[in-house]
């Protein structure tokens, strides 16, 4: 019986070592050598400190900043661990809300967001990504339309010409990956960092 088990055990140990240790270490080493910034998390550094990642969205709420998509991520309620509370862009709990199209709670949230955005920019259609969450709740990008929609609010808050802000958006525009995958987009963190630099001048 031991003769029959030995090949299976040897194969189990060998495949575990190859697929669980050697392969991940090799891929990590190659990624670190070829793409060091991406392998380290695509972190963005300013003045010697890390301010975020280009892959994970952040919550910007001030009137003078570009805002990302709504985030449905949650965290444990400090008062009652059996419940959750809203925690936008919580990377430790990446998920959507799982609210379906017939959900009254979802309809109420979208209605409130739409009303606020229409009041901010009357007469203009609200881009859909400013009222819908992504599947992960951590989307770092918005559509060019969503970024441009916010220009009048930021121009008023910062006392800047709208044309200058539109130029900033155009400068941060990323096209489709490989020319055909995904949609054109603007990274909100990168755009806000450029905006802060502009305000310092």
Swiss-Prot record:
Keywords: ATP-binding, Cell inner membrane, Cell membrane, Ion transport, Membrane, Nucleotide-binding, Potassium, Potassium transport, Transmembrane, Transmembrane helix, Transport. The keyword Iron does not apply. It is a single-pass membrane protein. The keyword Magnesium does not apply. GO terms for molecular function: ATP binding; P-type potassium transmembrane transporter activity. It comes from the Bacteria. It is found in: Cell inner membrane. GO terms for cellular component: plasma membrane. Its main location: membrane. The chain crosses the membrane at residues 7-27. InterPro entries: KdpC. Coiled coil: none annotated. Pfam families: KdpC. Belongs to the KdpC family. The system is composed of three essential subunits: KdpA, KdpB and KdpC. Part of the high-affinity ATP-driven potassium transport (or Kdp) system, which catalyzes the hydrolysis of ATP coupled with the electrogenic transport of potassium into the cytoplasm. This subunit acts as a catalytic chaperone that increases the ATP-binding affinity of the ATP-hydrolyzing subunit KdpB by the formation of a transient KdpB/KdpC/ATP ternary complex. This is Potassium-transporting ATPase KdpC subunit. The gene is kdpC.
């Amino acid at each position: 019986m031991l003769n029959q088990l030995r090949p299976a055990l040897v194969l189990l140990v060998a495949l575990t070592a190859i697929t669980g240790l050697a392969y991940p270490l090799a891929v990590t080493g190659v990624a670190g050598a070829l793409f060091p910034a991406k392998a380290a998390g695509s972190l963005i550094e300013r003045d010697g400190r890390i301010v975020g990642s280009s892959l994970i969205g952040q919550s910007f709420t001030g009137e003078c900043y570009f805002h990302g998509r709504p985030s449905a991520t949650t965290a444990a309620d400090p008062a009652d661990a059996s419940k959750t509370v809203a925690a936008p862009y919580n990377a430790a709990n990446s998920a959507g809300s799982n609210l379906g199209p017939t959900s009254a709670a979802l309809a109420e949230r979208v209605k409130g967001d739409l009303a606020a955005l229409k009041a901010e920019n009357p007469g203009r259609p609200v881009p859909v990504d400013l009222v819908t969450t992504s599947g992960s709740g951590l989307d770092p990008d918005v559509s060019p339309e969503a970024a441009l929609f916010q220009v009048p609010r930021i121009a008023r808050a910062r006392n800047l010409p709208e044309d200058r802000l539109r130029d900033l958006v155009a400068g941060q525009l990323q096209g489709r990956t490989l020319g055909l995958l995904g949609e054109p987009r603007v990274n909100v963190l990168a755009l806000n960092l450029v905006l802060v630099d502009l305000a310092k001048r």
